């Protein structure tokens, strides 16, 4: 089991923490990359996503501000 945790700040300044569970690492990575793509398209100012294994170890993590990512 793998978990994808998202932390995103919307345009109103509210922070949402979204957690989804996935059976395989491939499914989790697919969701992870979809989250990052959606954040880039929507212009969410701060976004973080992480894939965590069943044992609690981070597999993949990325956090950025769009102003920095656009450079």
Residue spans of the language-model regions?
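Compositionally biased, intrinsically disordered low-complexity regions
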Residues: 9-13, 24, 65
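Generic "edge-of-domain/loop-turn" microfeature
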Residues: 11, 27, 56-58
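Functionally constrained cores in energy, signaling, and assembly domains
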Residues: 6, 22, 58
